[in-house]
Amino acid sequence: MAISVEQKNSLKRELVEGLQMAPEISKIIIFGSFLVDDAPNDMDVAIVQNSNLPYLTLAMKYRKMTRAVARQLPLDIIPLKTGAKKCAILDAISKGEVIYER
């Protein structure tokens, strides 16, 4: 199903509204097909944060905080530690769109 630019912008706003209350989050980055496709299958979201909680705990926390968006379009949420080591996924994320920065 095609998604208009206005709908994409609305989803991005809702995502930020759902996550911005978490004090450990410093940046939210959208990357992947959501940025370039008219009919993306999902939204890839990198969340740069400084928490010491385990990856899975953070991923589940952020999924709960973004349920309203996930009901409209599936989300792939990737919590990243501030200053994460170089890896393949960071290349894709570096080409993404920062939608929130503290």
Which residues does each PLM region occupy?
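Short, well-ordered beta-strand segments
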Residues: 44-46
